[in-house]
Amino acid sequence: MKSKMNANINKIVRKFLKNLLVATLITYILFFVIFIFLQKSFIYFPDDQDFKDCQGFLDYEKKTISNTRFYFKQGTDNALIYYHGNAGSTCDRSLIKEFFEENNYSIIFVEYTGYSNDQTKPNKEQIFKDVENIHKFLTKNNLNNNVVYGQSLGSGPASYHASLGNVGKLILVSPFSSMRDLIKSKIKIYPVSIILTEDYNNQDLLSNYNNRLLILHGGEDKQIPVHHSRKLYEGLKNTNKEHIIIENFGHDDIWLSSIFKKSILDELNIKL
């Protein structure tokens, strides 16, 4: 009687474990498929801010060149080009423009296709086309030896811009070595290298960039931990580079740091 009861219990346990394994496998596959088809939704977070109705850039021209939109302020024949992160819009970054205006650079704040109420879905291919259009605009208008600034996701288009040439300085804030590395560190159970289409590989893009490179990163950054920018920094052969870790600041508040402000201003004060 007892052995029969034990056999029934073992049968129930085996059935439970089998069902649990099947459910786990189905869940794994389901989330895998969801990530494949919706990965852009996990990377890009645009808002519906209207590009033309931005109060923060009232004193800038609103330009559109080959479907690439940007805010532009004419200054010297050296330009500073700003590429923002993955959330919100360029309009949100108007608070930081004062850092760049003291040196009378011509200033460009780039808006990505798919952002600021644009109906296109953001994607790497189109964002790189935005970069190419900005690069052509700079060349056409004789804006040379420029400063390129990219923050977070913006380090990808900024690095691509640097790879196209005519960049005297590159400033990267909270960057990663590659999007592939970043996502692998967050989603360890999936073969990201197989399924990721939106890989911004800054390590490769900057392999031949040898001009000035400044990397700033908050020591308390949880979204893109500082070891990602350290890997980028250490993996580049460029000898004209600097990596500054700003302790006690994270991903979204780094720009409030006095060290951040001083580092940016000092960098811009050095003539190209």
What spans do the regions from the language model cover?
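An N-terminal hydrophobic leader/cap segment in hydrolases
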Residues: 16, 20-66
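Short alpha-helix in the alpha/beta-hydrolase fold that links the catalytic acid
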Residues: 96, 202, 211, 225-234
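Membrane-embedded segments
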Residues: 69-137, 151, 155-156, 160
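Acidic catalytic loop of the alpha/beta-hydrolase fold
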Residues: 89, 220-224, 251-252
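Alpha/beta-hydrolase fold nucleophile elbow
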Residues: 142-152
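Hydrolase active-site cap/lid region
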Residues: 155-211, 258
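Short beta-strand/loop motif that positions the catalytic acidic residue
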Residues: 209, 215-221
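C-terminal catalytic histidine-bearing segment of alpha/beta-hydrolase fold enzymes
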Residues: 231, 238-272
